[in-house]
Amino acid sequence: MSWLRQGSSGGVASAGHSGNIRQRPIDAATDCDPRACYDSFCKHWQQAHEIIQHSAPPSHDDVLGVVSHLDYMVTLLLVELHHCNKVALPTTEASGPPAAPCLEYLLSENLLDKLYEWSCATGRYANAVRLEQLKLYELLVSHSRHQLLCHEPFLRPLLKILASSQGEIFPPDLEKRLVILLNQLCVVLMQNVHLLDLFFFSAQTQVQEQIQNGSVPPPKSGTTTNFIIFSLLIPYVHREGSLGHQARDALLLCMALSQKNSNIGTYIAQYSSICPLLVTGLGGLYSRLPNSIEISAIDWHRITPDDVTEIPELTLFMNALEFCNAVVQVAHEMIKQQLLDFMYQGFIVPVLGPAILQTLKGKHFQTNIDSQISAMSYLDLILRSITEPGLLRAFVRFLLDNEKFDGERILDALVERLNSPDANLCMVTLALFDTLLGLHCEDLMLELLLKFMLPGKHVPLSHRHKINKIDPYLSSSEFFLELSPDVMKRARDLAKPKAIQEHPVVGDIPSPVMSKTIGANWNYYGVHTGDSLYANIQAYLFEAHWRIAQCQKDCLKWANSYRYQKWPRHGQGRVQAHALDLARQFFSEYGGSGPVVASGETGEKQLDSLQSIGESSGYESFKWRPADEESEATETTLATTASEVELEHNSSSISSGLAASGRREPWRISHNNRNELVLTDLDFSEDLFAQGTVSLGPFLNAIWGKLQTFTSNSLYVNLHLTGLITRLAWYPLPLIHSLLLRSDIVITSDTPSFHQVLRILKQQIDAELPVTEDSLEIIDVARSSLIDREFRLVNTRKGNEGSPSHHNLQQQQALNPAQQQGQQRSAYATLSAATPVQATPTSAYDPFRRSDNKRRSISKSITSMFSRKSAPTAAASAAPANGSSASSGLSQIYAFFTGAASTLVGSNSSSESRGFAPGQQSAGTCETSLSTQPPRPTTIASGSSSNSSMGGSSQTLSAHSNATTTHSSSTLHGLDGGPPSFSSEPVSLDSVASMGIIASTSGTERSRDLALCAVLLDEWLKELAAIAQEQSVVLVTEQTL
């Protein structure tokens, strides 16, 4: 080895250390003599070739000798490739020596083919020889890129060794080398698609030649066409660890190749078993998931990325699900459609359906709450993880399918669980619905809400013309602010000298008190970037504007606009014509002859008289609209489903027809221009004598029922509940606004309206928590505790391990069970007994990285401070105290509302956003004030933890937290305890001290619970007021465009 100069002796190893060759340092070109390197390479091959020729059945020493010489040859090739910096392919011209003489010798002497032929006769030593061959191919492919694949002396033995590997079971080290080589080949083919035929068609030709020559057995696939690289990768698709990841990456490259080469797509779809293998494997991995998730906190409501990493079975399942999602994104349309069909028929319906419904021989399990919680948590995780619209459509179809489960829809079963008496099941269900609403899917919104609201029967006839008006939104903002409990108004008045101005004027300089308390940095919107955004109406306005804009952007893709517009339905033309004749006859008899023509003052009086008729009679048939009975618009049909009619087209044709006739839509007629109304027709499409109320659907009934028990719910349930209702208010749909944001519209439903419930809540809090010194003290403590909790949640999201929260984590875990059980005796102590903060680092696998937005935007900073993760805090639980009741007069009113939906129990949850879009899902990490939401989608997004101001549920704790397991308070839903809660939100021991302060505060536990409700209700009303104001801005903008 004289060709190696001083300092390069470490470049060659002994035969006993061949496995470490690749790790030895290779010096620069000046450290070796290329000629000596070439001579040594030829010498080693001559010695190896002598052993190959003279060994009949090779002995152990023979194989060891060949492997040793091959090891030296690999090292010399590596030195040469580093010397050249690139591979110079063999040239046919004799002008000058080749740049890589060792490689030239390897190809010209057909060494690789001779080596393969000998390896087939090595018997039990075949794997050792194959391993060295794979190392050699891996080295050459990685350094030569695509150039060597064009040469038959290299390609032919490579195809032979790959063909002989089909259907074989290899040891782990050999499998690893094989997958690495296949991965490298896929990368090369992706960059050089023109070489694809070498492995797609030529591979089969080579195999047939081998079969004819008898050199290798025929492939076990039995197909007439074979993409050998893809076939070898299929068995490793569900493997764990790095081997499985590399195999799936290579398979995805093959799927992407199918977009560029239709023959590959046809082969994968028709001749390979990848689609059924993926689906059956996904179902098998789902069956291995824990049937009952370990819960260690009272506020747990969804699976987080940390939970995924700490549950091995869940990690494998999410890997497989993410791979399916990626295949649908990049594969050929034929493969995509086949995989979606297999997913629906082979996994979603037969596996997820029974798991969610929890059925056994057609009967529901009676006591399987834990299994239902787990199944719904898995479904929520799936919906937040997938982003491909085609796959999301399959899951939406699954929720709405009424044929696969004996006429029972999955969506209806989920709605029923909102009424479950189990608190954990309610929160998990609401977390799932928050995810579903975050998809902004038209079909889901239609089934949950819009199909019950489109007829407009929930609004009295005399109020229906107000639905699309804009002015009342501003008065609605004032209405929400007036609903604040009296004790909160008094507390706000007392704190005015120390508080930030509600409406700062541009150019105002914050006072020293403001700067000291909150911070002196203000942005363009007047929102400070200091410590807390509590009670800052500008922050709510900013958040509402951003959320409404995002929701509006996603809803632009809907097929229909869903603005209320009562037109006759299909097939009712003759009935309506007869009704119109009756109306004209009625007015001709009592109002004079001739058509109903009004102008100036007469028109205004007549219009008012029609309104008074509707208000006094109560009949919903007296609906009026300015339309020409002879216009083509009267024959337009109103679709109650998205598939029947495109409302946007109808609306445009209607508007054009009205404009041509000089008439205006009712929602464009203000008080000042009623004299422009020239013709009014009554709509008798409904029964003239229809009476009673209508249903808003089971979903809203369940939500309203839970809202009626606001003062008896736990703090976490109320936080999630307000978040879900807030999400509904973000939708730019006047029909939904008529229920939530329009205080001037009367609702005639079978349950109390939203605004009636808010009034009752205000009355109840005012009656049970009067404005006294003790009440103000409790309010101040509750408010301070929630703000303190907000700070801790912000620190947790920042992952600051040096924060007090991280230090308190260790202290909280050190608490003995007796101490934690003692804390559970109080509803407030239950909050402090939950799992403390865990500042966990980012895991290797994060199923939410898609929606993780690392930008430090102003909106992110604002919303992060308003994050409402469901951490137990110094605040108190809102669980009702036994024996507490409202005052006598108020209790009768309250009993009326609670009795109407006494069985409705629900809870709200935060979710993050992937959009149907998701869908999005979306998108970035979704955080909001006083509400929870999904991103998106965002959304596999590592920051998918859902946050909301003043409380909510964080997603940072693992499913196997070491914290002591706690149980739901027996007062939450009248239950004797409940299943253990799985902590999704961190809490520090700071809350323990706050709890002690609250516990020592004068007043009963009921009054302390009401104080928390009052603080939360006050902040939520501000948020609703901000949403109402911003919705008016959006509607005005729409009309001006």
Curated annotation (Swiss-Prot):
Positions of post-translational Phosphoserine modification: S803
Keyword Phosphoprotein attached: yes
Pfam families: DUF5917, KELAA, RAI16-like
Polar residues: compositionally biased ranges: 825-843, 907-933
Keywords: Phosphoprotein
Location of the region described as Disordered in the Swiss-Prot/TrEMBL record: 797-856, 907-987
Entry keyword annotation includes Amino-acid biosynthesis: no
Positions with biased composition (Low complexity): 808-824, 942-973
Family to which the UniProt record says this protein belongs: Belongs to the FHIP family.
UniProt protein name: FHIP family protein GF15501
Native organism: Drosophila ananassae
